[in-house]
Regions:
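Beta-propeller folds
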Residues: 12, 19-455
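Sec-dependent N-terminal signal peptides
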Residues: 4-14
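Short, Lys/Arg-enriched, disordered terminal segments
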Residues: 1-5, 19-20
Length: 455
C-alpha cells in the first residue's frame, strides 16, 4: 500500500513538470532589444513656401494591441468594425514642427494621449494640418495650427475612415468635408448569432471570364448588409472652430475631390448590386459633381457592375474611367475611354482616347488625344504642355509623349520609347511643383522640363 502511494506521488510530481507554465510575453536582453527596437528617423513633409517642416514619428514595429484588433473582411476591405478604420493602418505616434531657419524642432502640443495618428492633410494655404486619431472606440478629427504647433480636437470619435480619404479641405482653409457615421446607424450583423438574411445564389450563365482569385469577397446576404453598413456615411462640413453642418445625406461614399479652384466637388458613390466574385472596385458606381454649397451640377459618370473582363493584362472596362480634375485648370475633368472595347485581342489603330470636359458640363466633352497603347497616366503642365504615358504589357513597351492639350491636331512627340523592365534606360521622373491651385504640375523653366532619376 505504501509502495502504491509512493508511486502515485511520484507520478503526480512527474506530471507537474509537464504542466503549462504561466508565462507572459518576454523581452530579450537590452543588447538584442537595442538592435531590433530602434527609434526610426522621422518622415518629413514640407510646405511649398519652404517655411515649415512636419516631422512624423512611428514605432519600428506594430504593437501587440494593433495585431490583436478585431478585423472584418468584406468586399476587398479589411477594417476594424469597432473603430471604423482599416485594420492595416500603420499609425504615427508623434508630431513635431520645425521652422526651416530654426535650429530645433517644436513638439506639437495638445496631442491626444497615446496618439494613433493617420490621414495627415495640409490645408490649401498650408497654415493648418488636419489628421485623424484612432481611439479605442472610433476615429476623431484633429487640426494643427502650424505657426503655433498646437493641436485641437474638432469631432468626437464618429469619423468613418473605412473607405477612401475620410476628409478633404474646402478651399476657404476654414472648413473640412468629413465622412461621419450616420446618426441612425444600425448594428452590424453577427454571423455567429444572426440568421442569414437570404440564401446564397450563384448564377452560371456560361459566360467566359478571366477573373483573378480575389481575397476578402462578400459571401452572403449578411456580408452584403454589413458591407453597406460600414461604408455608408453622412458628409459634414466641419469648421475649424468645431461647428458642424450636414452637407450631404447618408450614402455609400467612395471618394470626394474638390476642383482645383474649389468651386466644384466630384463625389463617387458605390451602387448596387454587389458581387460575390469581384471586389468593390468593380462594383457599380456613380460620379456626380456638386457646387461647393452641395447643389447638384451634373452626373458625369455611371459605371455598371463588371464581373466579366476580356482576357489579358491590358484588358479594361468600357465607358469612362480614370476621371480626374485637370490640375492646371480651374474646373476641367479629364477621362479615358477604351476604343477597343477593352479587349487586347481586338486589332485597332488606337487603344484609348483621352477627353476633356469643362465645368459646368453643359457642352459635350472634347477629344484631346488617342493612344496607340493602353493609357498609363498624365502629368499636366500648362495650357500648351502635358506629358502622357501609354504602355503594353505583352511587349513591355512604354512610351512617353509631349503633347499640347489645347490642340488635338498637333501630333504628340515621343520623348521616350523603351522597355519598361530596362531600368538602365529609365530617364527618371518629371519634376513637379505646386501651382496657384495647390496642385502638382510640371516644373517648366524657359520651355524646359526636368527629370530626376537614379542615373
Amino acid at each position: 500500500m505504501k509502495l502504491k502511494a509512493s508511486f502515485i506521488l511520484f507520478l503526480c510530481l512527474g506530471l507537474s513538470a509537464f504542466a503549462q507554465e504561466n508565462l507572459t510575453y518576454q523581452k530579450p536582453s537590452k543588447s538584442i532589444l537595442d538592435l531590433a527596437d530602434f527609434e526610426r528617423a522621422p518622415s518629413v513633409s514640407m510646405d511649398t513656401k519652404k517655411e515649415y517642416m512636419l516631422l512624423t514619428y512611428r514605432n519600428t514595429y506594430k504593437t501587440l494591441d494593433d495585431l490583436n484588433q478585431e478585423e472584418m473582411r468584406l468586399g476587398g476591405l479589411r477594417i476594424n468594425p469597432v473603430t471604423n478604420i482599416s485594420s492595416t493602418v500603420t499609425y504615427i505616434n508623434n508630431l513635431k514642427i520645425r521652422k526651416i531657419n530654426a535650429k530645433n524642432e517644436t513638439q506639437v502640443s495638445g496631442l491626444p494621449e497615446n496618439p494613433r495618428i493617420s490621414n495627415l492633410s495640409w490645408s490649401p494655404n498650408e497654415t493648418k494640418i488636419a489628421f485623424s486619431h484612432t481611439t479605442a472606440t472610433g476615429v476623431e478629427l484633429w487640426v494643427i495650427d502650424v505657426a503655433t504647433a498646437k493641436a485641437t480636437k474638432l469631432t468626437a470619435a464618429n469619423v468613418n475612415a473605412n473607405l477612401g480619404n475620410p476628409f478633404s479641405w474646402f478651399k476657404d482653409n476654414e472648413s473640412i468635408l468629413v465622412k461621419m457615421l450616420p446618426k441612425n446607424r444600425a448594428a452590424l450583423l453577427d454571423a455567429k448569432k444572426d440568421l442569414p438574411l437570404g440564401p446564397i445564389i450563384s448564377n452560371a450563365d456560361g459566360s467566359k471570364s478571366q477573373n483573378r482569385t480575389y481575397q476578402d469577397l462578400l459571401k452572403n446576404k449578411n456580408d452584403e448588409a454589413n458591407f453597406e453598413n460600414i461604408i455608408t456615411s453622412e458628409l459634414y462640413k466641419v469648421n475649424i472652430n468645431g461647428a458642424t453642418t450636414l452637407f450631404k445625406s447618408a450614402d455609400m461614399y467612395a471618394g470626394e475631390d474638390f476642383s482645383p479652384d474649389g468651386n466644384y466637388l466630384m463625389v463617387t458613390t458605390i451602387e448596387k448590386p454587389f458581387s460575390y466574385i469581384v471586389p468593390l472596385n468593380r462594383f457599380p458606381s456613380k460620379t456626380v459633381v456638386y457646387d461647393k454649397e452641395g447643389k447638384m451640377v451634373k452626373t458625369v459618370n455611371e459605371v455598371p457592375l463588371f464581373e466579366i473582363m476580356p482576357k489579358g493584362f491590358m484588358a479594361t472596362r468600357t465607358g469612362k474611367r480614370s476621371m480626374n480634375w485637370r490640375n492646371d485648370k480651374p474646373a476641367t475633368l479629364s477621362f479615358v475611354e477604351a476604343l477597343d472595347q477593352g479587349d487586347p485581342a481586338n486589332k485597332v489603330d488606337f487603344r484609348d482616347e483621352i477627353s476633356l470636359w469643362n465645368a459646368p458640363f453643359d457642352a459635350a466633352p472634347t477629344s484631346m488625344m488617342k493612344t496607340k497603347q493602353r493609357y498609363g497616366g498624365i502629368i499636366w503642365g500648362n495650357e500648351t504642355t502635358a506629358i502622357v504615358v501609354d504602355q503594353w504589357y505583352d511587349t513591355r513597351n512604354t512610351k512617353t509623349y509631349l503633347i499640347n492639350p489645347s490642340d488635338a491636331n498637333q501630333a504628340p512627340k515621343v520623348i521616350s520609347d523603351r522597355n519598361s523592365q530596362d531600368i538602365y534606360s529609365d530617364p527618371g521622373n518629371f519634376e513637379t511643383i505646386k501651382n496657384q491651385y495647390g496642385k502638382r504640375v510640371l516644373a517648366i523653366e524657359n520651355n524646359n522640363l526636368f527629370l530626376i532619376g537614379a542615373g
